[in-house]
Amino acid sequence: MSKVLEQVEAIVAPITDELQLELVDIAFEKEGPNWFLRIFIDKDGGVDIDECAAVSEKVSEKMDENDPITQNYFLEVSSPGAERPLKKEQDFENAVSKYVHVTSYEPIDGRKMWEGTLVSYDGTTLVITITDKTRKITCEIPKDKVAKARLAIQF
C-alpha cells in the first residue's frame, strides 16, 4: 500500500470503526482524465446506501481538514460487492469453502490464474480445488506469491 493510501486509511479507519463497519479496501485510481478515491465498506448482512452516505460525509469532512491527496478526485464509498477482494488474513479465513479467483505474480506449476473452491488456508498457503476440463485438481499457492485474490461467482 502506498504512503498516501496509508494516510487515507488512517483517516478512514476510525470513521468506519465508529460506525461499526468493516473497512474492506481503499483504492486510488485514474479513469480517463479523472481520479477516484474508492472506499469499500461492509458488515454482516451488507451495507445500505445510508451507511455509504454517512461514511462519505464523514470522510469528506476529515479529508477537507488535512487531505494527503494533492490532486482533485471524486470520492466514492460502496460495498465490495459479490466479488469482494481478499486482502486481510481474516478475509482468506472467511473464504474457506467459497469459490475464489486468484492470480499470482509468477507462474506456479505453469499457471498464473486459478478459479475454484478455497479448500483451506493456513496463513501461508492457499489450497484451491479447480476443475481443469473434466478433472478436479488441488493446487497449493503460497500466500506471498498471490498478486490478487477475490471471491468469485461460479457459473
UniProtKB/Swiss-Prot annotation:
Primary location group: cytoplasm
Keyword Cytoplasm listed: yes
Keywords: Cytoplasm, Ribosome biogenesis
SUPFAM superfamilies, alphabetized: YhbC-like, C-terminal domain, YhbC-like, N-terminal domain
Database matches in InterPro entries: Ribosome_maturation_RimP, RimP_C, RimP_C_sf, RimP_N, RimP_N_sf
GO biological process, one term: translation
Gene3D superfamilies: Ribosome maturation factor RimP, C-terminal domain, RimP-like superfamily, N-terminal
One Gene Ontology CC term in the entry: cytosol
Localization per record: Cytoplasm
Keyword hit for Cytoplasm: yes
Family: Belongs to the RimP family.
Function: Required for maturation of 30S ribosomal subunits.
Name of the protein in its database record: Ribosome maturation factor RimP
Source organism (scientific name): Listeria monocytogenes serovar 1/2a (strain ATCC BAA-679 / EGD-e)
